[in-house]
From Swiss-Prot:
Sites of Phosphothreonine modification: T44
Subcellular location: Cytoplasm; Nucleus
Descriptive protein name: Forkhead box protein O
The organism of origin for this protein: Drosophila yakuba (Fruit fly)
Any one GO cellular component localisation term in the record: cytoplasm
PANTHER family registered for this protein in UniProt: FORKHEAD BOX PROTEIN O (PTHR45767:SF2)
Keywords, sorted A to Z: Activator, Cell cycle, Cytoplasm, Developmental protein, Differentiation, DNA-binding, Growth regulation, Nucleus, Phosphoprotein, Transcription, Transcription regulation
DNA-binding annotation, residue ranges on this chain: 95-201
Length: 628
């Protein structure tokens, strides 16, 4: 054993490159390429580009390849060349740098007649693109087939042609007139469509028509948002107030912030400050006169009706109480602004020539508000009693064509006298007239109030005795007593009518075997007519006063008892001939005929019981329908 260890060790083995295996240790430096490389955890496409990547200049553009018409044998070579040209770059898709549109372009271009159906495009993808070779089944092909259909309809380089054969899919061909590159996105071109341009043109034409016609509308101060997109920010392009060009805005108008896409808030009609001062009086202040009568009329309108009555009587008594020569003093004038006083003194066309301060003026008189509804003549008589030359009714010159209404008759008459002698004579005459007028007014007022009260009372409560029952046409009145009684019972339920009709029912059952005579029918109809007339007369007689239900119930019971007695007498009179007739029939007929007769009598009696049964208080108004 030990001798084996003493032998020499085997020689070193050499590698292919002449280096011993032991020398491959730490003496030689390791290559940098063997170091571990960092890798992203996600394997999604596209892969991240390296840091030192430079895009090659001679790269094959997909847009150039998409519009090239390739030969059938060059399609695979073109794909390989495209992949080889971009082997250093990251791939856009899992199968390479070509998009779906590029693959479809190669597929259509590889066909002999330059057209393929949708199913043929699918087959070309599976056969020529390695990525889709194992994805041809229906389960794994749903996604990329949907993408192919989407690209066919989206890009303008593809054109759909109807197939000549029936039941076959359409052909897809390359559009020679298509622009190179990708088609313009439809969403980006939505703001510059022809419809938008037409709308702008229509709006401008409408504005020009308004400018020419000179129409001033309600919204003229604000510009139209549709037609002011291309206009400047400092002009009103839509204003029809100015026929030529845009209207330059004043600096009082401020602008609002807006975008280029929307023009709704370009110009604001809100003024920065108020341009017109508030003068505090109406526009026609130069022609108006604030008179004493107008001021007092406004004060009187705020008072109540009772205060107006007392003021009217007090003014009539105080206005002409100076029979002994002592004139009454007018009330102090109300406050007036200075400009109104000057306008009154300068421009009043109704003022008389300067009465002296010592002259007397009569107390103003107005028409009371309550006398407007009545035919009151207090104001008319007062105006007629005065001389027309001495009365001045002050009206506002701003309304020269207006006629004073009953509300505006609260004006006063300023009577200016010429001397003390005429004053005394006129005062005595007017005092007498005024006393007479006052008495007449009081009489008219009392009479009118009494008449109104009586009229109201007569309208509210008319006596029922005025209703004439004698002239009432009773003969033409049709009344169903049975329905009337049923209605009354359904409303109140106070009527309790008990009619013992057992004897009548038994007599009618016994006599029902024979036929009813015409006299019975006529008697029944007469009884019903009499009962109707009696009920009508009773109802009409009780209509003048309040209806008493107890009296009506008693009357109905009496009438029904009388009808029962009459029916019993008629049944007794007709019972004997019916019995004789029944005996003859029983003797002549056999057993079969007797049984049929019994059935007939039973049916007749049941029908009669059904017709003449008094389950509710009712009166027979017509013969039964089964009687012929």
């Amino acid at each position: 054993m030990m001798d084996g260890f003493a032998q020499d060790w085997p020689t070193l083995t050499h590698t292919d490159n002449g280096l011993a295996m032991d020398q491959l240790g730490g003496d030689l430096p390791l290559d940098v390429g063997f170091e571990p490389q960092t890798r992203a955890r996600s394997n999604t496409w596209p892969c991240p580009r390296p840091e030192n990547f430079v895009e090659p200049t001679d790269e094959l553009d997909s847009t150039k390849a998409s519009n090239q018409q390739l030969a059938p044998g060059d399609s695979q070579q073109a794909i390989q060349n495209a992949n080889a040209a971009k082997k250093n770059s990251s791939r856009r898709n899992a199968w390479g740098n070509l998009s779906y549109a590029d693959l479809i372009t190669h597929a259509i271009g590889s066909a002999t007649d330059k057209r393929l159906t949708l199913s043929q495009i699918y087959e070309w993808m599976v056969q020529n693109v390695p990525y889709f070779k194992d994805k041809g089944d229906s389960n794994s092909s749903a996604g990329w087939k949907n993408s192919i259909r989407h690209n066919l309809s989206l890009h303008n380089r593809f054109m759909r042609v109807q197939n000549e054969g029936t039941g076959k899919s359409s052909w897809w061909m390359l559009n020679p007139e298509a622009k190179p590159g990708k088609s313009v996105r439809r969403r980006a071109a939505s703001m510059e469509t022809s419809r938008y341009e037409k709308r702008r043109g229509r709006a401008k034409k409408r504005v020009e028509a308004l400018r020419q016609a000179g129409v001033v509308g309600l919204n003229d101060a604000t510009p139209s948002p549709s037609s002011s997109v291309s206009e400047g920010l400092d002009h009103f392009p839509e204003s029809p107030l100015h026929s030529g060009g845009g209207f330059q805005l004043s600096p009082d108008f401020r602008q609002r912030a807006s975008s280029n896409a929307s023009s709704c808030g370009r110009l604001s009609p809100i003024r920065a400050q108020d341009l017109e001062p508030d003068w505090g009086f109406p526009v026609d202040y130069q022609n108006t006169t604030m008179t004493q009568a107008h001021a007092q009329a406004l004060e009187e309108l705020t008072c109540s009706v009772a205060d107006e009555l007392t003021l009217c009587t007090q003014q009539q008594q105080q206005g002409f109480s100076a029979a002994s020569g002592l004139p009454s003093q007018p009330p102090p004038p109300p406050y007036q602004p200075p400009q109104h006083q000057q306008a009154q003194q300068q421009q009043s066309p109704y003022a008389l020539n300067g009465p002296a301060p010592g002259y007397n003026t009569l107390q103003p008189q107005s028409q009371c508000l309550l006398h407007r509804s009545l035919n009151c003549s207090c104001m008319h008589n007062a105006r007629d009693g005065l001389s027309p030359n001495s009365v001045t009714t002050t009206m506002s010159p701003a309304y020269p064509n207006s006629e004073p209404s009953s509300d505006s008759l609260n004006t006063y008459s300023n009577v200016v006298l010429d001397g003390p002698a005429d004053t005394a004579a006129l005062m005595v005459q007017q005092q007498q007239q005024q006393q007479q007028q006052q008495q007449q007014q009081q009489q008219q007022l009392s009479a009118s109030l009494e008449g109104q009260c009586l009229e109201v009372l007569n309208n509210e409560a008319q006596p029922i005795d005025e209703f004439n029952l004698e002239n009432f046409p009773v003969g033409n009145l049709e009344c169903n007593v049975e329905e009337l009684l049923q209605q009354e019972m359904s409303y109140g339920g106070l009527l309790d009518i008990n009619i013992p009709l057992a004897t009548v029912n038994t007599n009618l059952v016994n006599s029902s075997s024979g036929p009813l005579s015409i006299s019975n029918i006529s008697n029944i109809s007469n009884i019903s007519n009499l009962s109707n007339l009696s009920n009508i007369s009773n109802i009409s007689s009780n209509s003048g006063s309040s209806l008493n239900l107890n009296q009506l119930q008693a009357q109905l019971q009496q009438q029904q008892q009388q009808q029962q007695a009459q029916l019993q007498q008629q049944a007794q009179q007709q019972q004997q001939p019916h019995q004789q007739h029944q005996q003859q029939l029983l003797l002549n007929n056999n057993n079969n005929s007797s049984s049929s007769l019994e059935l007939a009598t039973q049916t007749a009696s049941s029908n009669l019981n059904a017709r003449v049964q008094y389950s509710q208080p009712s009166v027979v108004t017509s013969p039964p329908s089964w009687v012929h």
